[in-house]
Amino acid sequence: MEVAEIRQKIVENKEKLTSFRRSLDLDRLEEEIALLENHMTEPDFWNDNIAAQKTSQELNELKGKYDTFHNMQELSDETELLLEMLDEDDSLKEELEENLMQLDKIMGAYEMTLLLSEPYDHNNAILEIHPGSGGTEAQDWGDLLLRMYTRFGNANGFKVEVLDYQAGDEAGIKSVTLSFEGPNAYGLLKSEMGVHRLVRISPFDSAKRRHTSFASVEVMPELDNTIEVEVRDDDIKMDTFRSGGAGGQNVNKVSTGVRLTHIPTGIVVSSTVDRTQYGNRDRAMKMLQAKLYQLEQEKKAQEVDALKGDKKEITWGSQIRSYVFTPYTMVKDHRTNFELAQVDKVMDGEINGFIDAYLKWRIED
């Protein structure tokens, strides 16, 4: 690395540290740490063991952020000092480059912890795809999205499982529900929630005309045992049906598929992946709890948005991302303006750039 490159890298690192400091609000962070430490010294702190463990975990996370920031600051200062000494001692160049590499690695990991710091970002995720109107063309678009997300999940180390699959009449899907199991699944996939628009020459149109199709994607965190969502048995209607794989493969001779309807809200969920009715009911119940929790969070968000004003609704006319196959190739996120011309790579699951851009946009917004 040339000295000019090293100087530029040091300037960029200082700018990043300034951004980290601003987003962290160190003064507030110090106050929060002090409050939690004082709380933990109270005589009755451990009377509620679950609450105490939660507080202890929160304190460790805050201290981790605080200590890591100061470690980065010290490493950055040391790097600057080495640069000043480089004119007198060329042998310091190797140590300087090692410091820069170490700082880059720490900053990259630290940036991810800041981007994924919202509640439930670390949870597993449930993702649903619902094609819009448009028949076979729209249902095929839903199937392409299913393939994209499955490949993304597999490439990034997630365990991907189909919870429910409703095949299209001629091709594609009517709906599909997937689970993603692994660290930060919800935090990463929440960027995909919204309407996805496709523009292409339809393979189902003999006249080879250009078609526009839509599909909506819903993403929910899979709730763990620390979050309670009350669902009364009287509020649930359960139907059973024969389940099978995509395209009707392996159709069961007994009714193992389960469909749950939450009567007060009208929410419907179903699971067909398990070989037993009991297993599918358990999976469907988890999906229902996640949907009810999301519904409650959306209500709270709407109340806040009503106070803020200027809330843009997610409708078929306000897609979050467009995938253009013709007359040119381009995938563009309309929230962040991040775009890629390599449509094939995106459809093969390479959506990390869109996710990173969204997470940074959320922090800046």
Swiss-Prot record:
Record keywords: Cytoplasm, Methylation, Protein biosynthesis
Annotated GO MF terms: translation release factor activity, codon specific
Location(s) in or outside the cell: Cytoplasm
Keyword Cytoplasm appears in the UniProt entry: yes
Sites bearing N5-methylglutamine, chain numbering: 249
Post-translational modification: Methylated by PrmC. Methylation increases the termination efficiency of RF2.
SUPFAM superfamilies linked: Release factor
GO annotation, cellular component aspect: cytoplasm
Role description: Peptide chain release factor 2 directs the termination of translation in response to the peptide chain termination codons UGA and UAA.
HAMAP family per the UniProt record, alphabetical: Rel_fac_2 (MF_00094)
Family label: Belongs to the prokaryotic/mitochondrial release factor family.
Protein name: Peptide chain release factor 2
